[in-house]
Amino acid sequence: MDSNTVSSFQVDCFLWHVRKQVVDQELGDAPFLDRLRRDQRSLRGRGSTLGLDIEAATHVGKQIVEKILKEESDEALKMSMASTPASRYITDMTIEELSRDWFMLMPKQKVEGPLCIRMDQAIMEKNIMLKANFSVIFDRLETLILLRAFTEEGAIVGEISPLLSFPGHTIEDVKNAIGVLIGGLEWNDNTVRVSKTLQRFAWGSSNENGGPPLTPKQKRKMARTARSKVRRDKMAD
């Protein structure tokens, strides 16, 4: 096992512990609490994968951080902070929408890279909006927290979430997963739109009809799907 992988996990465990203390003292806002919960699940997955105990890793992580802070000068800290771009937290969904439980009549799940896509195949002929909470850096989507598909009535019918055992994803991973989710929902004659906020930070543009610009690969895949559906309809007639 790579030593850097272990030390990174140990430091992450300790920093999570520090952030938990902030929340316990009621100093954290809603996005801060949301990231804390998400990172807790991620740390559990990483700990299981690495075979490391989180409590023991936290103590070692504390020693690593204390050693760094002891050697760090105030001037170096100021320069480091000034040169590091700050990420922003973007919220399409409310806390209630983000944390609400939902159920599928005809569940379908697909793993696309480091992301898990879930959708209810029983949903037909609905107008659906994709909304997401995510972080942004340099005006581009950095990390997806959670994406959900909502009907006009407010029901959740689909979701994209990071895999806990596979931390880290790119903006292309997110766009590909969105393409898969849209294709799956449109299969049942649903009309799918993407929120303008998500369009702006994922694709850098906003489409009037609410649809994201698709890659040539996604367009070919959707065209094949449409032709296959037409053939089946003709055979049924």
From Swiss-Prot:
Q: Where is this region: PABPN1-binding?
A: 223-230
Any one GO BP annotation for this protein: symbiont-mediated suppression of host type I interferon-mediated signaling pathway
Annotated region CPSF4-binding: the residues are: 180-215
Primary localization: host cell
Q: Which GO terms describe its cellular component?
A: host cell cytoplasm; host cell nucleus
Cited SUPFAM superfamilies: Ns1 effector domain-like (SSF143021), S15/NS1 RNA-binding domain (SSF47060)
Modifications made to the protein after synthesis: Upon interferon induction, ISGylated via host HERC5; this results in the impairment of NS1 interaction with RNA targets due to its inability to form homodimers and to interact with host EIF2AK2/PKR.
Position of sequence motif Nuclear export signal: 137-146
Localization terms from the record: Host nucleus; Host cytoplasm
Offer one Pfam family short name for this entry.
Flu_NS1
Skewed-composition ranges (Basic residues)? 217-237
Motif Nuclear localization signal is found at 34-38
User: Keywords, A to Z?
Assistant: Eukaryotic host gene expression shutoff by virus, Host cytoplasm, Host gene expression shutoff by virus, Host mRNA suppression by virus, Host nucleus, Host-virus interaction, Inhibition of host innate immune response by virus, Inhibition of host interferon signaling pathway by virus, Inhibition of host PKR by virus, Inhibition of host pre-mRNA processing by virus, Inhibition of host RIG-I by virus, Inhibition of host RLR pathway by virus, Interferon antiviral system evasion, RNA-binding, Ubl conjugation, Viral immunoevasion
Alphabetically, the GO molecular function entries are: protein serine/threonine kinase inhibitor activity; RNA binding
Please list where the region (RNA-binding and homodimerization) is annotated.
1-73
Q: Does the keyword Ubl conjugation apply?
A: yes
**Keyword hit for Transcription regulation:** no
Domain of life the protein comes from: Viruses
Q: Where are the stretches annotated Disordered?
A: 205-237
Entry comment, domain topic: The dsRNA-binding region is required for suppression of RNA silencing.
Biological role: Inhibits post-transcriptional processing of cellular pre-mRNA, by binding and inhibiting two cellular proteins that are required for the 3'-end processing of cellular pre-mRNAs: the 30 kDa cleavage and polyadenylation specificity factor/CPSF4 and the poly(A)-binding protein 2/PABPN1. In turn, unprocessed 3' end pre-mRNAs accumulate in the host nucleus and are no longer exported to the cytoplasm. Cellular protein synthesis is thereby shut off very early after virus infection.
Q: How does it assemble?
A: Homodimer. Interacts with host TRIM25 (via coiled coil); this interaction specifically inhibits TRIM25 multimerization and TRIM25-mediated RIGI CARD ubiquitination. Interacts with human EIF2AK2/PKR, CPSF4, IVNS1ABP and PABPN1.
The similarity comment for this entry is:
Belongs to the influenza A viruses NS1 family.
- What is the protein named? Non-structural protein 1
Species name? Influenza A virus (strain A/Memphis/18/1978 H3N2)
